[in-house]
């Protein structure tokens, strides 16, 4: 069976195959079928080759397959919430990687705090200490490389201030914000729920998705995006800080241009 024609397989021909993917996305099923039927080693390089050749014949289905693997890994497999299967995770994302390297995630790294708060990004992360995070919605659409959108909604629980350094920083925020006091964040009142929405759209520079997006050396899918991050909370006083404090309100809505995200680990993870 030729690689470039695997994306044209009718779904009925796959009905008797056992596949590891929990998603019903036909592209993921076809990818599993290809490696199983042809007894091809499931390596990152072979996965990239499979996608790159498929992209040359059916761009829409290949991109939707890549997006579906991203969704499956985060929403179905609950990669951010569940304890890691370290062997599987290391094969897909790398031996020195952690959940903070998964895109998206709610951490100083995942929220690009270093670009918003250079020099104090770690302290800001402690001010909004993350206790849990969960992907609750994942939507995507693709028409062409100038018209696509991925939106991922995470819910989090957190605590305002988790050490002496972050407490001092909070006090400096409070000193410049009327209507909020330190007592608003003591005891149980320090706990909060939040919503973080990551929106990925075509980059505004000249980078475009193409066959070169699928690279064999090193094996990667370097997908170009502009990223918008929106954060909100139901905590009344924290919401006041997010609305009025000059430093804190930077977190509320931020846009990052010229980003690239390697989506190969998600595709590979779904096939392992």
Swiss-Prot record:
What subcellular locations does the record give? Cell membrane
Supply the PROSITE patterns for this chain: PROKAR_LIPOPROTEIN
Lipid-binding residues (covalent, S-diacylglycerol cysteine): 21
The record's section on InterPro entries has: Lipoprotein_3
Cellular component per GO? plasma membrane
Name the principal localization, coarsely classed: membrane
Q: What highest taxon heads this organism's lineage? A: Bacteria
Question: Where are the bilayer-spanning segments?
Answer: none
Per the UniProt entry, the signal peptide is 1-20
Which UniProt key words apply to this protein?
Cell membrane, Lipoprotein, Membrane, Palmitate, Signal
Membrane-protein topology: Lipid-anchor
N-palmitoyl cysteine-type lipidated residues: 21
The text of the family note is:
Belongs to the MG439/MG440 family.
- What is the protein named? Uncharacterized lipoprotein MG439
Q: Which organism is it from?
A: Mycoplasma genitalium (strain ATCC 33530 / DSM 19775 / NCTC 10195 / G37) (Mycoplasmoides genitalium)
């Amino acid at each position: 069976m030729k690689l470039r024609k695997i994306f044209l397989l009718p779904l009925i021909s796959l009905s008797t195959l056992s596949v590891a993917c929990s998603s019903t996305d036909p592209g993921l099923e076809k990818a599993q079928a290809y490696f199983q039927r042809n007894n091809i080693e499931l390596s990152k390089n072979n996965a990239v080759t499979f996608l790159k050749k498929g992209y040359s014949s059916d761009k829409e289905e290949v991109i939707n397959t890549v997006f579906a693997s991203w969704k499956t890994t985060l929403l179905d497999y609950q990669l951010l919430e569940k304890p890691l299967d370290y062997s599987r995770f290391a094969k897909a994302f790398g031996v020195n990687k952690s959940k903070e390297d998964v895109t998206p995630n709610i951490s100083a790294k995942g929220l690009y705090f270093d670009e918003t708060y250079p020099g104090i990004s770690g302290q800001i992360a402690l001010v909004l200490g993350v206790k849990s995070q969960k992907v609750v919605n994942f939507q995507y659409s693709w028409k062409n490389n100038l018209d696509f959108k991925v939106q991922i909604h995470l819910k989090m629980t957190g605590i305002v201030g988790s050490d002496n350094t972050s407490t001092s920083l909070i006090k400096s925020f409070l000193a410049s914000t009327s209507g909020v006091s330190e007592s608003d964040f003591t005891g149980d009142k320090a706990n909060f729920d939040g919503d973080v929405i990551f929106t990925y759209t075509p980059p505004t520079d000249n980078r475009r998705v193409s066959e070169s997006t699928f690279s064999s050396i090193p094996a990667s899918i370097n997908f170009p995006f502009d990223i918008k991050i929106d954060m909100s909370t139901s905590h009344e006083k924290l919401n006041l800080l997010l609305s009025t404090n000059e430093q804190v309100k930077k977190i509320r809505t931020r846009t990052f241009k010229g980003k690239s995200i390697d989506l190969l680990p998600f595709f590979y993870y779904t096939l392992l």
